[in-house]
Regions:
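Alpha-helical transmembrane bundles and membrane-interface segments of multipass inner-membrane proteins
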Residues: 1-198
Length: 198
């Protein structure tokens, strides 16, 4: 296993830690996180989760950079990278929606988009074609990561001024999700629905 793949695996491990941190009933077992009354009040639980999410998100850029720089791009690495990306962002979005910290429509749109795009990629792979990433998809991922980070930090410092930057970014990411899904379909529609020879 090369270094970029190890970094990708680290992202998966951090995702599991995040899920446990956000879902485990610490209060029920006598563990209570302090809340810091700074810019609206943030629980230490979410501060830690936010820091872990930032580190995990950065590994997404680091593993790709190292793989390209050192010519260590492998099929296993690409597969794990895609799984790690979806697991990190989608799991946190679903948890935050379940805790009423973000709108439930956000993970619904993002997850449905991923299902559609993955179906297109699988269809293409079955016909020997690799579907390249597109600009709107990359922008969607970056916007999602920033918006999710802000949501974990309870929209600080913008919450203090009543500006819901986390919600704005996440809804922009939803729009980009839809746009990128449509673009993926348009680019690959002839592959999905080949024209029959007359």
């Amino acid at each position: 296993m090369n270094l970029p793949t190890k970094i990708t695996v680290l992202r998966l491990v951090l995702t599991v830690i995040l899920i446990i941190l956000l879902c485990f009933p610490f209060y029920d077992v006598g563990i209570q996180f302090p809340t810091y009354n700074v810019l609206g009040g943030i629980s230490l639980q979410y501060i830690i989760a936010g820091v872990i999410f930032i580190v995990a998100s950065l590994t997404d850029f680091v593993d790709g950079y190292l793989a390209r720089k050192n010519n260590q791009i492998t099929d296993t690495g690409k597969m794990l990278d895609a799984i790690a990306d979806k697991a990190l962002v989608n799991s946190v979005l679903i948890i935050l929606a379940g805790q009423n910290m973000i709108s439930a429509i956000i993970p619904v749109i993002v997850v449905l988009r991923d299902i559609v795009v993955n179906a297109i990629k699988m269809e293409a792979a079955g016909k020997g074609k690799v579907v390249a990433a597109i600009g709107s998809g990359k922008l969607k991922t970056a916007t999602l990561m920033v918006g999710t980070t802000l949501a974990l930090f309870c929209n600080a410092p913008f919450e203090h001024w009543g500006i819901y930057v986390d919600d704005i970014l996440l809804f922009v990411a939803c729009i980009l999700s839809i746009i990128s899904a449509v673009q993926y379909f348009n680019i690959n529609k002839e592959l999905i629905f080949p024209k029959k020879a007359k």
